[in-house]
Amino acid sequence: MKILHICSEMYPLIKTGGLADVMGALPYAQQQSGNDVRVLIPLYPQVAEKIGETNEVATIGTFAGLVTIRFTYFNGLGVYVIDAPHLFQRSGNPYHDSGYADYPDNYKRFALLGYLGAQLSEGLDQWWGKADILHAHDWQGGLACAYLKSWNSPVKSVFTIHNIAYPGRFHSYHLHELGLPWHFFQAEGLEFYGEISYLKAGLYFADKITTVSPTYALEITEEIAGGGMHGLLQTRKAQGRLHGVLNGVDDTVWNPETDTNIVATYKPSYMQGKSKNKAELQQMFHLPEDKDAMLMVMVTRLTEQKGADFILDRIDELMEERVQLVVLGSGSPHLEYLLNEARSRHPEQIGIYIGYNEALSHQIIAGGDVILVPSRFEPCGLTQLYGLKYGTLPLVRRTGGLADTVVDSNKESIEQRTATGFVFNYPSSDDFLEAFRRAVNLWKKNKLWSSVRQNALAQDFGWARAAASYQAIYQEIV
């Protein structure tokens, strides 16, 4: 089957979040299953630095000016890039400037991504021909599905929601400029509160919709989590067109037995390396080398969505226990300030790195005892999966993919050897604190802790399973 993925980022070429991790792994897993898979992304400066030499496929005039599509194989996978310096040759973040203001021409930049994705799926690259499946991701790829529909294309489309909180909304007057028919601007189309939504374009016009966990697929059909799209998603669910497919872990990148970003590798049958990683992490963040302190870690965006405020609200109570906390992340200036204030009060227990560092994230997860993922909502979540893989027990809220991947450590689950972490139900600092205290109590029971950790290490969230689920969805429509 010929599959073309349309996305705005792909690890290791460029990454701002979990979408990149998915796109750096899923296409490879699908290729290993015998599919002919290619990916289309913009040629950002970061991509140009890493991708190497490319060959011109086509240069065409578009609503966004003259652009060139180029092609190369990257780590064995076919990758198309959009060479349009006037749109994508910008340093830093692919979506906004250094002041966090969205680029004013984002409507055009990502409409072009969708347009060229649709063109490629229709056979613009004569050497590859037509795709069987166009698979678009998040709002940045959503218009690809609308373009295919406007051309009455036989190519089937799948649209994946990685986070429904980002609808990709723009002024309706752009519709004509982008070459889409005006009759698409209605409730049964891509109109959304008087504007156009690229996310809704994907939801409305795709043949199938997927999202990144079964629980999130249910949650987004409800008003509280549906981002205003819940009515449409209820309809798509009733039609059998909405599916939840859990993300996986890329074993070539996240594997404590082979990870080159950590000071000592380890495996379930030989865990001494994890202790060495903990000691290294404590040294890196100038914390006392205390093997008996429960070392909590957090690799996250510092936002309310991620629940960082639950931790900060009760930070002084947490620090009354024999615990340490290491945080890697950035985001809300207010939350960054509160975190720094907490460190100034507890310098022997808290370490902070404001920003993002991929290699450091591996060392932090390998060195931690508990990874905190207390999100208000979480479509799938990847850091809890990395925690399981590295024997760093996740403490999570019961939402989205967190609910699908972590089993709470209660008396019954511990006895049945199914417990893999700690789960709290309600988005509040009180509920978080209760789960934290349960984690501390288990930490003090060394044999039980080791048993739960072995359960966590035994979990299999590889990409082969997810690729098989997508294959079954594709087969329903081709």
Curated annotation (Swiss-Prot):
Residues annotated as signal peptide: none
EC number: 2.4.1.21
Keyword annotations: Glycogen biosynthesis, Glycosyltransferase, Transferase
GO CC term, one of those recorded: cytosol
Pathway it works in: Glycan biosynthesis; glycogen biosynthesis
Record CDD domains: GT5_Glycogen_synthase_DULL1-like
InterPro entries from the UniProt entry: Glyco_trans_1 (IPR001296), GS/SS (IPR011835), Starch_synth_cat_dom (IPR013534)
Catalytic activity: [(1->4)-alpha-D-glucosyl](n) + ADP-alpha-D-glucose = [(1->4)-alpha-D-glucosyl](n+1) + ADP + H(+)
Record GO terms (molecular function): alpha-1,4-glucan glucosyltransferase (ADP-glucose donor) activity; alpha-1,4-glucan glucosyltransferase (UDP-glucose donor) activity
Residues the entry annotates as binding ADP-alpha-D-glucose: K15
GO-annotated biological processes: glycogen biosynthetic process
Keyword Ribosomal protein part of the UniProt annotation: no
The protein's role, per its UniProt record: Synthesizes alpha-1,4-glucan chains using ADP-glucose.
Stated family: Belongs to the glycosyltransferase 1 family. Bacterial/plant glycogen synthase subfamily.
Protein name: Glycogen synthase
Origin species: Actinobacillus pleuropneumoniae serotype 5b (strain L20)
Organism placement in taxonomy: Bacteria, Pseudomonadati, Pseudomonadota, Gammaproteobacteria, Pasteurellales
